[in-house]
Amino acid sequence: MGKMLSQVDVRTYWDFIEPGLREIKKEAKPEWRPEDIYSALASGIAELYVDIEQDPCESFIILQVKPSVFKPTQSLLIWVAYDKRENANGKYMEYIEHMAEQRGCNKVEFWTPWKGLADVLSHIGYETKQYIVEKEI
C-alpha cells in the first residue's frame, strides 16, 4: 500500500497548513477562507491528514465522509489536497482509497477547479462525472 497518512489535530498543525491553504486560496479562489477550514476541522466537520514522516510538514489532505443524497451510500470527499512535492497521487492515492473502503465509502470524490488534476486522476481510474456551472447574482 502507498505511504501512510495520519489524522492530526488542526490546533497542532495549523501553522504548517495555513500557508498552503493561503496559496490555494490565491490560485484557485475557492469560496472558503482558511479560517473556515480551521473551524470545520476544529468542530469535526472535516478531518486533517498529514504525512507525519515529512519534516517540515509540506503536504496535507482535508477530507470528509459525505452521505449520498439519493442512494444509501457515502463517499470520501477530498476538500483540499496539498503537496509541495511531485507525484502526491502516487504516494497517497492507494492509501486514501483503502481508507475510503475501510470507512464504508463506495467512492472517492475530488471537487477541483483544476482540469489538470482531473486529467491526472483520469489516468488512475477516476472520471469526471459532472461540471458545476454557476453565475453570481
Region spans (language model):
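Short amphipathic alpha-helix that is part of the acyltransferase structural core
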Residues: 1-32
